[in-house]
Design a protein with these regions (language model features):
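Short glycine/proline- and aromatic-enriched beta-strand/turn motifs that initiate or cap beta-hairpins
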Residues: 24-99
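Transmembrane beta-barrel domains of outer membrane proteins
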Residues: 81-85, 154-156, 212-214, 268-272, ...
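Outer-membrane beta-barrel "beta-signal"
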Residues: 34, 273, 316-333
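Outer-membrane beta-barrel channels and translocator barrels
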Residues: 30, 87-89, 158-162, 216-220, ...
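Extracellular/periplasm-exposed beta-strand and loop segments of Gram-negative cell-envelope proteins
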Residues: 47-73, 100-146, 175-204, 233-262, ...
């Protein structure tokens, strides 16, 4: 990450040093259609996927416990934006952003007892004997899908010789889907096999407002920064299933009329020409309150063992991106 950031900074410095006359950021008098395509390497954050507890029962006095976390890797995301500008009267634009990534891991445990937490802990299933004794082999899979769709009115305003401000206001729809699965077995008589799955589905709709500041450094190069804020209302649902030794447990949770927020931020370097722009940048989204479900519980493993709490309720997640894109304009200034 540090290398990519240094590269972007170096490009900006070199271009600034080679500057010609500063260009006004495009926008106030442009009339016509435009299309923007964006691709990104996106890292989801805040998922806090605790899939199991590892217990070392060789020392009954201290009984060390360790939460095991699934590490969600970065994946690709993309967005498309289509709009029409009426010049000084402003314009309309529609934007769709999507992130879809699957991860998996397989592990063999030769020392610790493994108690999976995907179902929610023993306060949910009342079965403290559901676990894997060493040696045990298990697989964890994760699927994350997030989408936003925006319909915005915008208006571009001159703020100086080099500055323009693009004011944005409109509507936003957002959705988040997550699947987490634990499946394992051991070779002893303790447990034949365990499979736990959890599905989270959250949808919301609301309003959005923001601004994009453009600063022209040279005739064909400038910087852009964007901040936007959305307030949304929606629902979150959770469905978990456990199959252990032929016994099936199922749990459904639903949260209605939740209020959440999405904050967008972005900083990019832009190379501009009359018909198109090229850019690279760093940005992301922070989702607060969306989704909002209970994915953990207080855990009591067996009589006499210490109790620990799990509270990974997805109350704040994020998507951080290094991205690049192109904008085409089909009208005239």
């Amino acid at each position: 990450m540090r290398g990519r950031t240094l590269l972007l900074f170096s490009l900006a410095v070199v271009t600034f040093v080679a500057a010609g006359s500063p260009a006004r950021a495009a926008g106030t008098d442009y009339k016509g259609w435009f299309v923007a395509l964006d691709v990104a390497s996106t890292q989801p954050t805040g998922l806090d996927n605790r899939y199991a507890t590892a217990i070392d029962l060789t020392n009954p006095t201290t009984t060390p416990q360790e939460f095991l976390f699934f590490d969600n890797k970065a994946g690709f995301s993309g967005s498309v934006r289509v709009g029409y500008s009426f010049g000084e009267l402003g314009g309309l634009e529609a934007t769709y952003w999507s992130f879809d990534n699957d991860d998996s891991m397989k592990k063999t445990e030769g020392t610790n007892y493994i108690y999976p937490l995907v179902f929610g802990g023993y306060a949910f299933n009342n079965a403290g004997t559901y676990g894997l004794a060493p040696p045990a082999t298990y697989t964890v899979t994760s699927s994350i899908k997030a989408h936003t769709g925006d319909l915005d009115y915008f208006r571009v305003q001159d703020a100086g010789e080099k500055f323009t401000i693009k004011w944005i206001g409109g509507l936003r729809a957002a959705s988040f889907d997550e699947d987490l699965t634990f499946e394992g077995s051991d070779t002893g008589a303790y447990t034949a096999g365990i499979k736990q799955t959890r599905h989270i589905d959250s949808k919301a709709f609301g309003v959005k407002a923001g601004a994009k500041l453009s600063y022209g450094l040279t005739k064909h190069f400038g910087l852009q920064g964007t901040l936007a804020f959305s307030i949304l209302q929606g629902t979150s649902d959770q469905h978990t299933i456990q199959i252990a030794n032929g016994v099936v447990d199922e749990l459904k949770l639903s949260t209605d009329h939740i209020q959440g927020e999405i904050r967008d931020y972005d900083l990019r370097a832009v190379w501009s020409w009359p018909r198109f722009d090229l850019y690279v940048g760093y940005g992301g989204q922070t989702w607060d309150g969306l989704p909002k479900v209970r994915t953990g519980s207080e855990i009591q493993l067996t009589t006499g063992l210490p109790t620990k709490a799990v509270s990974d309720d997805r109350s704040s997640i994020g998507f951080m991106s290094y991205h690049a894109g192109v904008v085409w304009r089909f009208g005239k200034s």
